[in-house]
């Protein structure tokens, strides 16, 4: 392979244009060829463990200095750090992508418009996908693997903190895929190259930013290319009057404590007033033991004050707390009068990510799930389940809080679009227009494109 | 009903905010209630034919003056003009929308993640849809009907030339829908209100502009809200070496002449060199008789020159011709050496709208259909079939040349998104994480949400 420190010296614009050219032939690479290429990527990564670890160690060493300087958190450096077992699991992830069903060439509908005039709606790749991500070097491999599986060309922009790790991984990917149309995966590194990418709306079909809310917002404000990303995860757990309080406590604990830094962790608990005294006294103890800071509205404060077995002083929640993604061991709590009030609170302050109701009453659960406007609405389950792997989508390219194209955890399906294939026999629209227009049949039937006749 | 000349004096911002509130309850209006409201709209429009015609006559009279002044074309005024039969067909269109299958509440997939932990992907409305359209007053009714059927609130901005017609139709719609959450349909009229709409990215989920390419481009460049629209229809017909030339001539004639002003009319013919002399001599005569102006590349010019039976002088096509949507009785023609050259020409100059190959060779057709990057790819059929009604989608809200969310003719499906519903039994993610993680089942099954247990 080429020296791990080298990448192609083309400009970002040339790279994007090459990706655009590659996308046209990539879309027609057979399932077998795409899967073979994925397997080769996994093998090449495993063969180059030492080289990857060496490059990563240099990135990590530099990042550690930034922790001392107060620039990075230790958690950030942890996400950056690779190990032999982590690299093995990256290779394993690539193999699992190879094993997934082909998302391409699926006939979604087949419809006879008239005799010998048949319309097929068939899944195809989107084209060129621009991605910007941070920290974890495994993101580069995951995004590349999902793009290849779904027949898309991809522009990869990783964080500067992972530059050496990303270069080695990128070169492993290129080395493993000589059979894939050259140019299908492009690494860009400079900050100003992101601007170039965002401006190339003729060449790039979709931008997927993964990073801070403000960065995603910046991308949305600075491109006319469609953006798939999530801006915030202000998720709620609502403990209903009909909740099983033991279950509610366990779920609210998991939703906050199991991994507080992620977007599907809960930020605000809403508690029905009828169960608030009893629920809060249980919940507070558990959160306190886990070191979770509580910010409560006035009713929460007063309930906790009057529950003699709780010694906490509850910090007063302000308006800002209801829209804050803490990403940390902090939770805000509000007591509500009714199911409707809980729904209204969520629709006003939530970020349309993931919302959960705890109740033993199925009708109340259904009302909540219908009325709350969010990508994922849960009944008696932790918000932390909102994840592509847990949802059974295989690997995920991200979670979307937008409502267009793909919503919630996005898997391979979100990287495809469709194309209409019409098979005719010389039909003209004039036949179906005017006063003696021939009517259409519009009958759906079971057939997949391409249709193969026995006589060839 | 209120006086047809009055509309609500709220600001555009208030209207959009009200639509946002309405959208939350609109999404839960039952199928029957939405269909009843659609039927009431059709009835109310029919009851108010005289009032609609009166308002329309005033719009048309003003527009006629602009024709004399050279501002509008007669075709523009024709599109603006309503008649009793046109109004009846508008009412009929609304009834046909009522009759279509409900696009909402459909369970797209059901997957067991684990015992008593079931995930349902269910179709839901998008939310608030902003639309900007021109000329035809029937567009206002069509867009409103499709939005209501799909549970979306809608902001309607029509052209000033149809202001009086649009006001009456809008008031008919409001009068007919007192049972629909108030605020679901909002009419805005001022040019500056469009800017307000484009800026309200927290409240508006999708913008659908219908109009000139430059207007759609303007919208894309001036909002961070997702845009569904089409910028150009530069469609091609490729006459292959294996084409049935009689069929090819008939299809190329229909694709250009049957309705040249629309986006799915052909703009460029590509002709394989082996059939060019024979095809062009037939085609030229037919186009000449229909008054179609021909712009040919050098090879087309020389072939036509040497074909003694053609008296035409062919205008030389310039580079600009290959990317021009004439929308008129003008066609450009290029002779190509091969199927691959035709594909390359289309992928370089086309607008990803609709492309058709004429050939009797199924393998060559398949190669073309796979390799051409367009929303609709046709084999032996006129490009003019690219249309929601002809495709059997029912009414269409527009044709998308983008690749994200909805592509080609967009029907009710394009106005929906989905929501993940997870039904659990108190599950925590901690159970499925770490070294002794419980594995997921991820088994798909047939069931629709909401699941009703017999015991309530």
Curated annotation (Swiss-Prot), chains A, B:
Q: Which Pfam family, giving just one, matches this sequence?
A: Aldedh
EC?
1.2.1.41
Q: Which SUPFAM superfamilies match?
A: ALDH-like (SSF53720)
Q: Name one GO molecular function term.
A: glutamate-5-semialdehyde dehydrogenase activity
Q: In which pathway does it act?
A: Amino-acid biosynthesis; L-proline biosynthesis; L-glutamate 5-semialdehyde from L-glutamate: step 2/2
Catalysed reactions listed for this entry: L-glutamate 5-semialdehyde + phosphate + NADP(+) = L-glutamyl 5-phosphate + NADPH + H(+)
Just give the chief location class: cytoplasm
Compartments where found? Cytoplasm
Q: Which UniProt keywords apply?
A: Amino-acid biosynthesis, Cytoplasm, NADP, Oxidoreductase, Proline biosynthesis
Q: Name one GO cellular component term.
A: cytoplasm
Its GO biological process annotations read: L-proline biosynthetic process
Question: Record's HAMAP family?
Answer: ProA
Which family, according to UniProt? Belongs to the gamma-glutamyl phosphate reductase family.
Q: What does this protein do?
A: Catalyzes the NADPH-dependent reduction of L-glutamate 5-phosphate into L-glutamate 5-semialdehyde and phosphate. The product spontaneously undergoes cyclization to form 1-pyrroline-5-carboxylate.
Q: This chain belongs to which protein, by name?
A: Gamma-glutamyl phosphate reductase
Gene that codes for this?
proA
């Amino acid at each position: 392979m080429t020296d791990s420190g080298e990448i192609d010296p083309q400009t970002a614009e040339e790279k994007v244009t090459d990706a655009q050219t590659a996308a046209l032939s990539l879309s027609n690479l057979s399932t077998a060829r795409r899967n073979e290429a994925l397997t080769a990527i996994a093998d090449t990564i495993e063969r180059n463990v030492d080289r990857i670890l060496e490059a990563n160690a240099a990135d990590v060493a530099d990042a550690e200095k930034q922790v001392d300087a107060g620039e990075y958190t230790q958690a950030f450096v942890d996400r950056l750090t690779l190990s032999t077992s982590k690299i093995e699991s990256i290779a394993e992830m690539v193999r699992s992508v190879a094993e997934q069903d082909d998302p391409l060439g699926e006939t979604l509908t087949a419809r006879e418009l008239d005799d010998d005039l048949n319309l097929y709606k068939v899944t195809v790749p989107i084209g060129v996908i621009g991605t910007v991500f941070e920290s974890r070097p495994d993101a580069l491999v995951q995004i590349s693997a999902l793009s290849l599986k779904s027949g898309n060309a991809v522009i990869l922009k990783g964080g500067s903190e992972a530059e050496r790790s990303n270069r080695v991984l990128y070169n492993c990917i290129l080395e493993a895929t000589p059979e894939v149309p050259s140019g299908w995966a492009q690494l860009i590194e400079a900050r100003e190259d992101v601007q170039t990418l965002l401006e190339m709306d003729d060449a790039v079909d979709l931008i997927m930013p993964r990073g801070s809310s403000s960065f995603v917002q910046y991308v949305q404000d600075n491109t006319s290319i469609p953006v798939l990303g999530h801006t915030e995860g202000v998720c709620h757990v609502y403990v209903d009057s009909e909740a099983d309080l033991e279950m509610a406590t366990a779920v609210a604990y998991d939703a906050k404590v199991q991994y507080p830094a992620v977007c599907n962790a809960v930020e605000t608990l809403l508690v029905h007033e009828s169960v608030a005294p009893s629920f809060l006294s249980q919940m507070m103890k558990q959160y306190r033991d886990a070191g979770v800071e509580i910010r409560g509205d006035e009713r929460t404060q007063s309930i906790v004050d009057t529950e003699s077995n709780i010694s906490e002083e509850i910090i007063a929640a302000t308006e800002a707390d209801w829209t804050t993604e803490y990403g940390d061991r902090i939770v805000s709590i509000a007591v509500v009068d009714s199911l409707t009030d809980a729904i209204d609170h969520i629709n006003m302050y939530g970020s349309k990510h993931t919302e959960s109701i705890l109740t033993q009453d199925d009708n109340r659960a259904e009302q909540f799930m219908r009325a709350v406007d969010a990508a994922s609405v849960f009944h008696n389950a932790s918000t932390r389940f909102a994840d592509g792997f847990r949802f059974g989508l295989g690997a995920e390219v991200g979670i979307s809080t937008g409502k267009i194209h793909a919503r919630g955890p996005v898997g391979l399906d979100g990287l495809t679009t469709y194309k209409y294939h019409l098979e005719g026999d010389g039909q003209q629209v004039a036949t179906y227009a005017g006063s003696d227009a021939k009517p259409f049949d519009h009958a759906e039937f079971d057939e997949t494109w391409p249709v193969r006749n026995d006589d060839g």
